Design a protein with these regions (language model features):
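Arg/Lys-rich, alpha-helical DNA-contact motif
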Residues: 2, 46-303
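Short acidic/His/Gly/Ser-rich catalytic and metal-binding motifs that mark active-site loops
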Residues: 42-44
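Polyanion-binding surface elements
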Residues: 1-40, 113-114
Length: 303
């Protein structure tokens, strides 16, 4: 195949020939690896004799996808483009429509993506924790409080079992220290982000972070039921379309939090935002979010 417009269904050998026509090294083993990681759907089984079968056929759309991924990899300045940098595009395509990416392929792509997210370096995890802290930390929060919350966040993400009885009070001390007004009366000065009519508190933001961590773990284990994935996609697809229509207006009303609603620059950043945002909806639909927020609420009551 030299032109995607001329594409027809093909075997793994056909895909290898396509790759070599582009000057890219390829083998049937590489094609199988792409299938395993969700970059390609499984080929369609063809039984042609009583005792055997012909090589499976990759759908026309998958053959075109294979070529486009190879072309994108060739344009990359990196000497090697790992799978986890490609799978967000596969997942984003699946979230948008049903025409190219199969549900089975999407599950494997989500597993690959989750494995990459779960294998983040300590430096990356620390940067994420500090970004969350910086969003909410009250100007009067001490460095000691910041360090304490950072340590608790990192320990909680690593263990998947946050110490809510310790973390929630520490979060409150960070985001809402006790202050005194002009009359000398003590009051709790809570710091939030987002829109005035629907502010996001620090404990809620950390709860969402933990939900995403739990979703990542479950996707890595492939333990989220396929039905939940499809239901979450259906709901997310509607909500994401509405958000895209509203985000400019939300940014205009966001004040200091306007950056939360600003669309990222570059298609790669947009794809990653799209995929990362799916985790929250999936966590709720799959029943993973409520137990986590129950723990957060219990921690708040114990304060």
């Amino acid at each position: 195949m030299t032109d995607p417009e001329d594409a027809v269904a093909g075997t793994a050998e056909d895909l290898v020939a396509d790759a070599r026509s582009l000057g890219a090294p390829a083998s049937t083993r590489m094609v199988k690896d792409w299938v395993e990681h969700g970059l390609l759907a499984r080929p369609q089984f063809r039984k042609t004799t009583q005792r055997g079968s012909d090589p499976g056929l990759f759908a026309r759309e998958q053959r075109v996808l294979f070529r486009k991924i190879l072309e994108a990899k060739r344009r990359s300045p990196l000497p090697r483009v790992p799978h986890h940098t490609v799978v967000p595009l596969i997942i984003s395509m699946w979230l948008n429509d049903d025409r190219v990416i199969t549900d089975d392929q999407a599950r494997r792509a989500l597993r690959t993506y989750a494995r990459s997210a779960g294998a983040r370096s300590h430096a990356s995890r620390t940067a994420t924790a500090r970004a969350v802290i910086d969003q909410f930390a009250h100007p009067e929060a001490s460095k000691q409080t910041r360090r304490s919350v950072e340590r608790l966040l990192l320990d909680g993400e690593k263990s998947r079992r946050p110490r809510w009885d310790t973390l929630v009070p520490a979060m409150k001390d960070l985001a809402a220290p006790w202050r005194h007004d002009a009359d000398g009366l003590a009051r709790l000065d809570a710091r939030t982000i987002g829109l005035p009519e629907s502010p996001v508190t620090f404990d809620y933001a950390v709860g969402l972070w933990m939900v995403k961590g739990e979703v990542t773990q479950q996707l890595e284990r492939e333990s989220i039921p396929p039905k939940a994935l499809l239901l979450a996609r259906e709901e997310f697809r509607r909500g994401w379309a509405e958000y895209q229509n509203d985000r400019a207006a939300l940014a205009a009303r966001g004040g200091e939090s306007a950056a939360l609603f600003t669309e990222p620059t570059g298609w790669e950043a947009k794809v990653r935002e799209h995929v990362d945002s799916f985790a929250t909806t999936l966590g709720r639909v799959a029943g993973l979010a409520e137990p986590i927020f129950d723990e957060v609420r219990a921690g708040l009551r114990r304060r």
